[in-house]
UniProtKB/Swiss-Prot annotation:
One of its GO terms (molecular function) is RNA binding. Keywords: Eukaryotic host gene expression shutoff by virus, Eukaryotic host transcription shutoff by virus, Host cytoplasm, Host gene expression shutoff by virus, Host nucleus, Host-virus interaction, Inhibition of host RNA polymerase II by virus, Nucleotide-binding, Nucleotidyltransferase, Phosphoprotein, RNA-directed RNA polymerase, Transferase, Viral RNA replication, Viral transcription. It comes from the Viruses. Influenza RNA polymerase is composed of three subunits: PB1, PB2 and PA. Interacts (via N-terminus) with PA (via C-terminus). Interacts (via C-terminus) with PB2 (via N-terminus); this interaction is essential for transcription initiation. It is an enzyme of class 2 (transferase). The gene is PB1. Pfam families: Flu_PB1. Residues 50-82 are annotated as: Disordered. This is RNA-directed RNA polymerase catalytic subunit. Gene3D superfamilies: 6.10.140.720.
Length: 757
């Protein structure tokens, strides 16, 4: 039977058809090889946008620096970073005038945060540049290494556990004439294997002490490591992103806390809220503009795109903003907040791994590390790479490039949003002093501009004025990529607005399916995704029911756990049939044990174990929830876990799901091959730190403590806690005298060992 596709849309309003335009099936592209070329592109482009600025040399590091601020005025059409300080300050002043007390209140909120934040805040976040090893590491390890090095160099303010005290150490470290660090290295030896009599390569991991002079240390402290951004759809070229080191992170965190607090109070800001809350906030602004444009006014909306937002931003502008925002605050607070932009004005971009060369004739491959790019003969490179290297050479120091202008991706999202909103704020009639006026939405580099005026000429004049005002603070609206429409239809941060925000359900499609973590988590994530889409994305009941059935089918095929009474033969079917036959209450079996599916769209919020608990045989309950099961290495039991789900557009989202720990919540073991590489020493450090943390949590069962940082302080805490507990237990008769003295002896031994070390 032929179906006429137009029939499908007879009852559907046009805006709902957006889900049928979904282009993103299949996997997104990932980057391979090094990001060195992309990073050089970024550095060269950033300097090109500011090329008419003034060159100076940093007295400490000798790095050449370009300062475009308060230089030439920007030109029409060409993107540039020529911001004017007085324009930025004036925009800030007007923002404060239309929001009385906003800066004052945000400063007070931030001051409280600054005094209360613990160092362990910095353990959040994924890969971080670890300056001690000069490469990326998980955040917790990078922090532990930094603190360990600080302490061995006599910087101990961090022992209080407050982030602000750790930052005091960072400041002191920059005044030191030298810093001593421990690095990992590996030796390779060719030895004969006794068994096979063949020659094999033996690797040994060593640690060695290394001294960094002031210049060397400062360069590392100011370095942002770069990587290639993965999984970007709809782009032909990859681009570089940056990960700052621990010295910068803490300062950035406080600046962003202040900016976040300001953004929360600005109705035009699309940050820091998300999802439905964001849609509601933005819909308000649109409603305001539409109701105000009575019959006499026209209203148009620009779906905006800025050219190279962060390469034209300038840390010096951010410094000016912070200086203004905090102008009546205590000196210490102003100093803490101004350090991040100052560090960014002096930042160095690490060029990554370097280039890989291969000779087809000799079947040889060799890596040219970034450090060698400064003086290698350029005849080996192709034309475009040669140009890049020639351009970047004057900026190179030790494999890093001096990059004073520009912000690198994703660093000051909140603060740059404040800057954007301050220009939107200037669109009020009392500031434009003419018949046109504007308002809009800003979320990091994405914006939507709504202009109202009595006629088309007025609209054009308003857009022009907005465009030029933006230029003066280093924001470059792209005329090529922005488009204008009657208000009521526009796109902003991948939300499509047509008389209200349209649910674009197809964006969520990639996150449906089986995640592949383990049987327990996958079931939970799968039903949670369906539940969330019913709440947020207009997923109707019939479609949801179908999605659920497809998910269960997918799940059973993934884990080969078809129902016990099925005819499908898999590797597991023999065992599952046996279980099915000996189970009295078959409804109680989990789907992953060949049980039936009891989920429907009404009970998606209940974890499967809870849903079936009353239906389970007693011995099945005992096997399922058995922490002593030797075949399962358990995660610590938490009621809520976080999964990373990939929407089609935008960053991977973190999604909470209920985690009931059972024998199905297994964790796959770590790949062995890492143990033969130079990472091994680092891995061992990480495992030791992890073990120490786990032990620490056994000692302090209350949830009130915050995990301390660095191994040494934990050991002290545990020893003193052990002594106190032992004394209490001994005096109340819970332990014998022999046990008590043995505990005391162990504590003394530990302290003795620490003294010798």
């Amino acid at each position: 039977m032929d179906v006429n596709p137009t029939l499908l849309f007879l009852k559907v309003p046009a805006q709902n058809a957006i889900s049928t335009t979904f282009p993103y099936t299949g996997d997104p592209p990932y980057s391979h090889g090094t990001g060195t070329g992309y990073t050089m592109d970024t550095v060269n482009r950033t300097h090109q946008y500011s090329e008419k600025g003034k060159w100076t040399t940093n007295t400490e590091t000798g790095a050449p620096q370009l300062n475009p601020i308060d230089g030439p005025l920007p030109e029409d059409n060409e993107p540039s970073g020529y911001a004017q300080t007085d324009c930025v300050l004036e925009a800030m002043a007007f923002l404060e005038e239309s929001h009385p007390g906003i800066f004052e209140n945000s400063c007070l909120e931030t001051m409280e945060v600054v005094q209360q934040t613990r160092v362990d805040k910095l353990t959040q976040g994924r890969q971080t540049y670890d300056w001690t090893l000069n490469r990326n590491q998980p955040a917790a390890t990078a922090l532990a290494n930094t603190i360990e090095v600080f302490r061995s160099n006599g910087l101990t303010a961090n022992e209080s556990g407050r982030l602000i005290d750790f930052l005091k150490d960072v400041m002191d470290s920059m005044d030191k004439e030298e810093m001593e660090i421990t690095t990992h290295f590996q030796r390779k030896r060719r030895v004969r294997d006794n068994m096979t009599k063949k020659m094999v390569t033996q690797r040994t991991i060593g640690k060695k002490k290394q001294r960094l002079n002031k210049k060397g240390y400062l360069i590392r402290a100011l370095t942002l490591n770069t990587m290639t951004k993965d999984a970007e759809r709809g782009k032909l070229k990859r681009r570089a992103i940056a990960t700052p080191g621990m010295q910068i992170r803490g300062f950035v965190y406080f600046v962003e806390t202040l900016a976040r607090s300001i953004c929360e109070k600005l109705e035009q800001s699309g940050l820091p809220v998300g999802g439905n809350e964001k849609k509601a906030k933005l819909a308000n602004v649109v409603r305001k503009m539409m109701t105000n444009s009575q019959d006499t006014e026209l209203s148009f909306t620009i779906t905006g795109d800025n050219t190279k937002w962060n390469e034209n931003q300038n840390p010096r502008m951010f410094l000016a903003m912070i200086t203004y925002i905090t102008r009546n605050q205590p000196e210490w607070f102003r100093n803490v907040l101004s350090i991040a932009p100052i560090m960014f004005s002096n930042k160095m971009a690490r060029l990554g791994k370097g280039y890989m060369f291969e000779s087809k004739s000799m079947k040889l491959r060799t890596q040219i590390p970034a450090e060698m790019l400064a003086n290698i003969d350029l005849k080996y490179f192709n034309e475009s790479t040669r140009k890049k290297i020639e351009k970047i050479r004057p900026l190179l120091i030790d494999g890093t490039a001096s990059l004073s202008p520009g912000m690198m991706m994703g660093m000051f999202n909140m603060l740059s949003t404040v800057l954007g909103v301050s220009i939107l704020n200037l669109g009020q009639k009392r500031y434009t002093k003419t018949t046109y006026w504007w308002d809009g939405l800003q979320s990091s580099d994405d914006f939507a501009l709504i202009v109202n005026a009595p006629n088309h000429e007025g609209i054009q004049a308003g857009v022009d004025r907005f465009y030029r005002t933006c230029k003066l603070v280093g924001i470059n609206m792209s005329k090529k990529k922005s488009y204008i429409n009657r208000t009521g239809t526009f796109e902003f941060t991948s939300f499509f607005y047509r008389y209200g925000f349209v649910a674009n359900f197809s964006m969520e499609l990639p996150s449906f399916g089986v995640s592949g973590i383990n049987e327990s988590a996958d079931m939970s994530i799968g039903v949670t995704v369906i539940k969330n889409n019913m709440i947020n994305n207009d997923l109707g009941p019939a479609t949801a029911q179908m999605a659920l059935q497809l998910f269960i089918k997918d799940y059973r095929y993934t884990y080969r756990c078809h129902r016990g009474d099925t005819q499908i033969q898999t590797r597991r079917s023999f065992e599952l049939k046996k279980l099915w036959d000996q189970t009295r209450s078959k409804a109680g079996l989990l789907v992953s044990d060949g049980g039936p599916n009891l989920y429907n769209i009404r009970n998606l919020h209940i974890p499967e174990v809870c849903l079936k608990w009353e239906l389970m045989d007693e011995d099945y309950q005992g096997r399922l929830c058995n922490p002593l099961n030797p075949f399962v290495s358990h995660k610590e039991i938490e009621s809520i876990n976080n999964a990373v789900v990939m929407p089609a557009h935008g960053p991977a989202k973190s999604m909470e799901y209920d985690a009931v720990a059972t024998t199905h919540s297994w964790i796959p073991k770590r790949n062995r091959s890492i143990l033969n590489t130079s990472q091994r020493g680092i891995l061992e450090d990480e495992q030791m730190y992890q073990k120490c943390c786990n032990l620490f949590e056994k000692f302090f069962p209350s949830s009130s403590y915050r995990r301390p940082v660095g191994i040494s302080s934990m050991v002290e805490a545990m020893v003193s806690r052990a002594r106190i507990d032992a004394r209490i237990d001994f005096e109340s008769g819970r332990i014998k005298k022999e046990e008590f003295s043995e505990i005391m002896k162990i504590c003394c031994t530990i302290e003795e060992l620490r003294r010798q070390k």
